[in-house]
C-alpha cells in the first residue's frame, strides 16, 4: 500500500512519541527526523528505526533531492514561523504542533475536513484537543453563550516550553473554544498538578445552555464526540455522565452542563500519565492520516 512520506522536525519527547505513532500508521511513512542536537535521544531512536536523521536543521531537509509529502513540526513557535513559508514553497504540507498558529487551528472531531486542503494546520494546545470537542458537541445542539475549561496536567509532564507559555496556552485555547467549539465566549485555565505519583490529565468543561435545552440530545452528542476521539486516543474517557444544573446565582442565572474527562496516554514513549502530550501526538497523527488519504486519492 502506498503511503505518504513524512519528516519529523524536532527531536524532543513529543517528536519521539509522535514517531512511534507514525510507525503504526497505515497511511504515513516516517522517513526523516531533523533536529539540532546530534546527541539527542530522539535522533538516536529514529536512526535505530531506520529513519534518515540530521542535526543540521530544516535547511538540510529542504536541500535533499527527495522531499517529504508532509512534515510534522514540534520545535517552537518562532522556529515554525520561519520554516512554514519554506515548506509551502517546496510543496510540503505541514502539521504544526507548536503555538505558531500559521495555519488554521484543527480539532479532528470538529473541523478537520474543512481544512484538509490547507498547506499548514495547527494543533492548538493539549487542553484544546481534550476539551474543545466537548464544547463543540454541546454547541451543535444548543447555543452556548459561555464555556470554560480547566485542564489539570501532571507537573512533571510540563516542560520549560509549556511553563514559559502558560498565557499563550490560555489565550489560544480560549480562542479555540469560541472559533471551533462554537461558544460565544470562552475561557481556559491550566493547572500544573504537583502530585507524586503523577496524576493523568483531567479536564472539566463547563457550558452555559438554555434553560429548556434538550438534555438527552446534549448527552448523546457528547457521547458521540467521545467515541470519535477514542478512535485515535483510546485513553480518552468520560469520568461520569454529563451533569446538568438549573439556573442559579452561582452560574450567573444560566442553566449549565458540566463534563469531566480524563486522558491516559498510550505509553509509546511518554509515560501514560502524560495524556496531555499524548493527545497532541495522537491528534496530529489523525490529522496527518486524513491529509495523506486525500493526497494519495488525488494522485491515484
From Swiss-Prot:
Q: Report the EC number(s), separated by commas if there are several.
A: 1.2.1.10
UniProt entry tagged with the keyword Transcription regulation: no
Q: Which reaction does it catalyse?
A: acetaldehyde + NAD(+) + CoA = acetyl-CoA + NADH + H(+)
Kindly list the positions annotated as binding NAD(+).
Answer: 11-14, 157-165, 276
Q: Does the keyword NAD feature in the UniProt annotation?
A: yes
GO BP: any one term: catabolic process
- Show the active-site residues: 126
Q: List, alphabetically, the InterPro entries matched.
A: Acetaldehyde_dehydrogenase (IPR003361), Acetylaldehyde_DH_C (IPR015426), NAD(P)-bd_dom_sf (IPR036291), Semialdehyde_DH_NAD-bd (IPR000534)
Taxonomy, superkingdom: Bacteria
Q: Which SMART domains match?
A: Semialdhyde_dh
Sorted UniProt keywords: Aromatic hydrocarbons catabolism, NAD, Oxidoreductase
One annotated GO molecular function is: NAD binding
Q: Which HAMAP family match?
A: Ac_ald_DH_ac
Return the similarity comment: Belongs to the acetaldehyde dehydrogenase family.
Output this protein's name.
Acetaldehyde dehydrogenase 3
Species per Swiss-Prot/TrEMBL record: Rhodococcus opacus (strain B4)
Amino acid at each position: 500500500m502506498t503511503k505518504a512520506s513524512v519528516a519529523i522536525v524536532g527531536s524532543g519527547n513529543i517528536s519521539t512519541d509522535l514517531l512511534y505513532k507514525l510507525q503504526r500508521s497505515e497511511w504515513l511513512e516516517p522517513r526523516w527526523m531533523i533536529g539540532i542536537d546530534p546527541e539527542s535521544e530522539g535522533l538516536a531512536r529514529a536512526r535505530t528505526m531506520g529513519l534518515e536523521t540530521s542535526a543540521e536543521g530544516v535547511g538540510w531537509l529542504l536541500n535533499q533531492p527527495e522531499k517529504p509529502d508532509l512534515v510534522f513540526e514540534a520545535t517552537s513557535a518562532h522556529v515554525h514561523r520561519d520554516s512554514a513559508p519554506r515548506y509551502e514553497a517546496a510543496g510540503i504540507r505541514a502539521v504544526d504542533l507548536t503555538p505558531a498558529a500559521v495555519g488554521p487551528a484543527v480539532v479532528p472531531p470538529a473541523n478537520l475536513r474543512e481544512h484538509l486542503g490547507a498547506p499548514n494546520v495547527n494543533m492548538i494546545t493539549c487542553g484544546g484537543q481534550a476539551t474543545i470537542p466537548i464544547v463543540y458537541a454541546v454547541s451543535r445542539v444548543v447555543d452556548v453563550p459561555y464555556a470554560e475549561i480547566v485542564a489539570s496536567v501532571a507537573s512533571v509532564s510540563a516542560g520549560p516550553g509549556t511553563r514559559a507559555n502558560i498565557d499563550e496556552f490560555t489565550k489560544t485555547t480560549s480562542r479555540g473554544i469560541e472559533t471551533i467549539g462554537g461558544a460565544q465566549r470562552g475561557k481556559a485555565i491550566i493547572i500544573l498538578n504537583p502530585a507524586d505519583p503523577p496524576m493523568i490529565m483531567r479536564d472539566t468543561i463547563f457550558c452555559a445552555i438554555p434553560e429548556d435545552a434538550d438534555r438527552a440530545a446534549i448527552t448523546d452528542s457528547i457521547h458521540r464526540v467521545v467515541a470519535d476521539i477514542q478512535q485515535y486516543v483510546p485513553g480518552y474517557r468520560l469520568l461520569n455522565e454529563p451533569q446538568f444544573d438549573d439556573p442559579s446565582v452561582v452560574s450567573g442565572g444560566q442553566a449549565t452542563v458540566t463534563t469531566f474527562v480524563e486522558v491516559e496516554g498510550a505509553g509509546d514513549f511518554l509515560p501514560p500519565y502524560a495524556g496531555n502530550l499524548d493527545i497532541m501526538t495522537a491528534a496530529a497523527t489523525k490529522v496527518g492520516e486524513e491529509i495523506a488519504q486525500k493526497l494519495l486519492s488525488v494522485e491515484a
